[in-house]
């Protein structure tokens, strides 16, 4: 709606003055009118998509959250954040498939849920390699206790100086695999054995991820436990 556009215009001007090169936009619900006359959901999506495009032109990269990534919005966005890499957790589900990555990898940047608000960091690093998703952190310069009564009250640990080493280590681990498949699409995803998956990309590069606590051997291929191997054809 026009109300949303006005809010964004004011913020965009301030961000441009601060020389910010990229933003993440949390978009309103498709039918929200912000005090304007009621409009249809389709028209609202149209206006929001236009706002994303204009913000990108003024500020730089614009990212949206996965659960707000409608086709109209994604057409103007640089990428998606908060990519969920979990199954629905129903008891009859045994494996997860990187559906979002299969659809979008190669056409836009994909980022994980914020790692400093989640557990199981070792497993999540492997998941990011399997899914072709880069790490994301929710960070502050100062101690987050100052945000206790704000919209960011959930940040228990976010100070950059506390997380710097973990950020560098995580990025290095993930980038070690994904640097070979930048801009490529996923063409195949298969389970080689329990806890071992292979993802193949359009440039014929395959990444084998081993989630188990023992080495995976197949001919000349050796994948250490809790690690991955990149196979270049």
Segments from the language model and where they lie:
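Active-site-proximal substrate-binding groove within the catalytic cores of carbohydrate-active enzymes
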Residues: 1-233
């Amino acid at each position: 709606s026009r109300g949303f556009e006005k809010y964004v215009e004011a913020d965009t001007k301030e961000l441009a003055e601060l020389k910010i090169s990229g933003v993440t936009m949390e978009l309103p619900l498709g039918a929200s009118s912000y005090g304007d006359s009621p409009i249809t959901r389709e028209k609202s999506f149209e206006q929001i998509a236009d706002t994303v495009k204009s913000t990108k032109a003024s500020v730089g990269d614009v990212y949206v959250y996965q659960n707000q990534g409608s086709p109209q919005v994604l057409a103007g966005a640089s990428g998606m954040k908060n990519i969920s890499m979990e199954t629905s957790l129903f008891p009859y589900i045994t494996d997860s498939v990187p559906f979002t990555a299969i659809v979008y990898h190669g056409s836009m940047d994909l980022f994980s849920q914020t790692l400093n608000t989640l557990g199981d960091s070792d497993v999540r690093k492997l998941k990011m390699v399997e899914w072709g998703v880069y790490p994301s952190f929710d960070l502050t310069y100062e101690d987050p206790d100052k945000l206790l009564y704000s919209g960011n009250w959930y940040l228990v640990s976010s100070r950059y100086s506390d997380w710097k080493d973990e950020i560098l280590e995580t990025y290095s681990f993930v980038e070690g695999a994904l640097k070979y498949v930048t801009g490529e699409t996923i063409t195949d995803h298969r389970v080689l054995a329990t806890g071992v998956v292979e993802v193949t990309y359009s440039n014929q590069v395959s990444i084998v991820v081993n989630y188990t606590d023992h080495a995976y051997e197949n001919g000349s291929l050796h994948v250490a436990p809790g690690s991955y191997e990149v196979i270049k054809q």
